[in-house]
Amino acid sequence: HREVFNAALRKRLDALAGGAPAEVFISSMDQSERTMTAVVATDRGERSYLLPAESAPELLGENRLSLLRAKLATTQPIALTARDGLPLHGYLTLPEGVEARKLPLVLLVHGGPWIRDRWSAGASNRSLQQFLANRGYAVLQINYRGSSGYGRAFMEKAIGEFAGKMHDDLVDGVRWAVQQGLADPARVAIYGAS
């Protein structure tokens, strides 16, 4: 989530996304803070723009996974409740052209804990998500307690819970996917690094 207090700048940034779901952010600016570069990131790629102070945006470049000759999967945000009642969020990437029913599942765990998984193409593990989904796997990512972006109290819930409730959050995510009918409980793998 972003909040832009300058209404004119907010309008310019929103226009870059063209109404599509996207993360739009300023990546740099000059000393006058009037000319800047902005990035529009989706689950399919990123575009960088130069935003001159008084003229139309100029496309600087694109990083698009969709240029690959492969069917790309869509990543959707999900919400679930941990066994102790804590609300959790994450992301689910499903293979294209396959019924989302009892799929093999890879639980893709981010490092940290004081980082998080993100939706956009700039997210860590985006290429791995697409690789696995392209081969028929559902990919589940859970922002377990201690992940950044949910406030200090959420981060502090990780204290003393590295092999406890943080682990439970991941298991609860897999159980959620099984209960939704998306994942086959006999075909679950876990992958991650820090």
Predicted regions and their residues:
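Structural motif
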Residues: 1-10, 44-50
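Trp- and S/T/G-rich repeat-edge/linker motifs of beta-rich repeat architectures
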Residues: 12-15
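Surface loop/turn motifs at the tips and blade-to-blade linkers of beta-strand repeat domains
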Residues: 17-20
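Serine-hydrolase catalytic core recognition
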Residues: 25-194
